[in-house]
Amino acid sequence: MKKNKSTIILILVFFVGLSVMLYPTISDYVNQLHQTRAVANYAADVDKLSDADYTAYFEAADAFNAQIAADPDALYFPDRFPSYESTLDVTGTGIMGYITIEKIGVELPIYHGTSDAVLQVAAGHLEGTSLPVGGASTHAVISAHRGLPSAKLFTNLDQLEVGDTFTITVLDRTLTYEVDNISIVLPTETDSLKVSEGKDYITLMTCTPYGINTHRLLVRGRRITTPDKLKHIRVTSDAIKIEPILTAPIMALPLLLVLLFWLLFAPRKRSSAKDKTHKTH
């Protein structure tokens, strides 16, 4: 009986340890599933729009960006722009588009604002900056967390180098940006996020150093021509990536359950020495 109890305790400890080890991977997988479906649903809703709808949405976004460019303090007073939340909110869920960073395997929906609820699961657009629809004198800022145990998000953003590219898809428009500047600043140093006259920039922002988060990593991209192969990509909700580290434990789980059953219920033979002792009595 004591051996059975010890075996059960050891097995429970093993499974608890395995659960702790797998939590980040499983949580990230669930987040990727949510993100991919959100992007796929967005793309499906966008496909239902007419050319007139596209024109109206982009004209509203361009008008908003003109207001941002005309106000040098827009970043500090985003409340001056009450139309922000409704502009480009095609689905009514707050998604304005999505970002794809092929080098680090990232595809995230972009939501209005950078509330903690948004940044826990996706990328957020920084209020007071241009909407990411491109054009001269625009500078959009897209932010996401890194180092969360539940999601990768921008965890590997520091792997990007000058010359790498990323894309932003809004409605039926896919824009490509080439990284031209990488910097680390204090949270209060925001001048580099302002609009530069005539330039078309998007800056990706996250916390740094990893796990300490006292500064901000800024990866700026300048607009370049989008290759034809990227202009008509459609995302499907089945495009889910399963990490190898998750696959192995899932395959091993049935074997572990069989082992547990055998340890608990397999008949045990007494040793011959004990049998002889009992016979003499």
Where are the predicted features?
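C-terminal single-pass membrane-anchor helix
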Residues: R234-H281
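Solvent-exposed, non-transmembrane regions of membrane-associated and secreted proteins
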Residues: K3-P244
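Intrinsic low-complexity, intrinsically disordered segments enriched in polar/basic residues
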Residues: K2-K3, T277
